[in-house]
Amino acid sequence: MKRGFIIGVFFLLAMQVAQSQTSQKKTAPTKTTTKAPASSSLKSTMQRGELVYKSVCLTCHQADGGGVPRMNPPLIKTKWVLGDKTKLITLMLKGMNEPIEIEDEEYHNPMPPHAQLSDQQIADVLTFVRNSFGNKASAVTPTEVKSVRAKVK
């Protein structure tokens, strides 16, 4: 009986030591992270911009940014999208009622103004458009939108 008791105690002690070592491995200090890299910030902007695009722009400009022939212009590699950010921001804020010509094709549907969107939302969606559908351009910032909004009122 004593022998069984000693074996049992030894077994319990061995289990306790093994548990303690496993526990120490789990609680080992980890590296602390510093400020997130800019790519993480761009990723967040793109995710937010995609949500705005899906709720505001998708119907006219389509999921692939290709637009609708002779009605709604494409957002793929055009000077409107990749060019002057001020013009693009103004277009978002004020809309457009006259036809627009892109690559020798005229588009006739008016674009409604989207001034109800916040500076952040406009910056996010324009950054999304400028970096989706095969586009590659600099981000639009909320500060840039705020500046243009103040001028076009």
What kind of feature is each model-predicted range?
Residues K25, T30-P37, D84, L88-L91, ...:
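Extracellular low-complexity Ser/Thr/Asn/Gly-rich intrinsically disordered segments
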Residues P69-I76, N97-V152:
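Axial heme c-ligation environment in periplasmic c-type cytochrome domains
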Residues K25-V52, V148:
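Electrostatic cytochrome c docking/interface patches
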